[in-house]
Amino acid sequence: METILKNLRHVPWRELQDSTGSATGIPLLLATITSGDEATAVAALVRLRQRICQYGFVVDQATAATVPFLCELAQLPQVPCRVQILQLLKNIADARQWENTAIAYPKLLNRRENYVEWEREARRAVRAHRGTIQGLLGEPDKELVQAAEELASALAD
């Protein structure tokens, strides 16, 4: 767990945007998820979801940078909300709202904020961690395995 938290400092969070503006609050939320207390971890994950995948679609550029940390947290047995993390990763993997909107409204592609590309980058980030998901299929927790299977299925498309 310490290794993942050390890597947080290598991400330029101040330069990235989430749904609230600057993504500087994301490292604290990720660290809080590792607290071991289920209620605290779930509350932090809910707040993180609102910042990176609100309403089920990728909201800003910080999502892709957050995905590797979520994948690592999902592997740690001491993290109490691993199922919810996998569900969030599936939402990110399935996100195509900006891409679909750009088909109908191509001017969206000319905006300074490149939501379509941020969404694609986030999906690629989830796909890059397929091996992590496969490793969870052998876990004893049936709910975790089901969430991992659903995510693996979404990545198989």
Predicted feature descriptions by range:
Residues 33-37, 74-77, 137-138:
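Alpha-solenoid helical repeat architecture
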Residues 22-27, 59-67, 125-130:
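Core helices of alpha-solenoid repeat scaffolds
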Residues 51-55, 73, 92-95, 136, ...:
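Residue-level signature of the C-terminal ends
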Residues 28-30, 69-71, 132-134:
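Buried hydrophobic core positions in alpha-solenoid tandem helical repeats
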Residues 1-8, 38-51, 86-89, 100-110:
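HEAT-repeat alpha-solenoid elements in large eukaryotic scaffold proteins
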Residues 14-19, 55-63, 96-104, 112-123:
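Flexible loop/turn segments at the boundaries of HEAT repeats in alpha-solenoid HEAT proteins
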Residues 1-41:
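N-terminal "cap/leader" segments of large eukaryotic alpha-helical scaffolds
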